């Protein structure tokens, strides 16, 4: 497979498929795709600006509530996990369901999970 063929295959993937690809590459090669954060040289002002400009949010499942099955279904729809993985995630609450997503996506996930009966927090 040439580099051009690989690029074409990657361009055709969904965001979830790309996320799974990154996780598989991290696991296979024992590396992390996390970006190294350099210490701010401007002091506290740079850190304060970063807090104000938060663009990525985590959706945390705090409590399942009485409708565990509905919450598992909602988690499966949001993450495209299999039944067992979604069930394990729900039973491990509090647990991050979605990480580093936009405000809009975080709000949509929160609404879907709350509609299923879960208690959700966005961080």
UniProtKB/Swiss-Prot annotation:
One of its GO terms (molecular function) is mRNA binding. Forms part of the ribosomal stalk which helps the ribosome interact with GTP-bound translation factors. Is thus essential for accurate translation. Keywords: Ribonucleoprotein, Ribosomal protein. HAMAP family: Ribosomal_bL12. Gene3D superfamilies: 3.30.1390.10, Single helix bin. GO terms for cellular component: cytosolic large ribosomal subunit. Transmembrane segments: none annotated. It comes from the Bacteria. It comes from Dehalococcoides mccartyi (strain CBDB1). The gene is rplL. Homodimer. Part of the ribosomal stalk of the 50S ribosomal subunit. Forms a multimeric L10(L12)X complex, where L10 forms an elongated spine to which 2 to 4 L12 dimers bind in a sequential fashion. Binds GTP-bound translation factors. InterPro entries: Ribosomal_bL12, Ribosomal_bL12_C, Ribosomal_bL12_C/ClpS-like, Ribosomal_bL12_oligo, Ribosomal_bL12_oligo_N_sf. This is Large ribosomal subunit protein bL12. GO terms for biological process: translation. Belongs to the bacterial ribosomal protein bL12 family. PANTHER family: 39S RIBOSOMAL PROTEIN L12, LARGE RIBOSOMAL SUBUNIT PROTEIN BL12M. The keyword Ribosomal protein applies. It holds the Pfam family Ribosomal_L12.
């Amino acid at each position: 497979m040439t580099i051009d063929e690989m690029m074409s295959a990657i361009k055709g993937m969904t965001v979830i498929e790309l996320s799974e690809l990154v996780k598989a590459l991290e696991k296979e090669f024992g590396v992390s795709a996390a970006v190294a954060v350099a210490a701010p040289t401007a002091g506290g002002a740079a850190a304060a600006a970063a807090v104000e400009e938060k663009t990525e949010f985590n959706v945390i499942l705090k409590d399942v509530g009485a409708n565990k099955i509905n919450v598992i279904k909602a988690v499966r729809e949001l993450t495209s996990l299999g039944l067992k993985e979604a069930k394990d995630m729900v039973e491990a609450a509090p647990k991050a369901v979605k990480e580093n997503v936009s405000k809009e996506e975080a709000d949509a996930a929160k609404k879907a999970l709350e509609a299923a009966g879960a208690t959700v927090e966005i961080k």
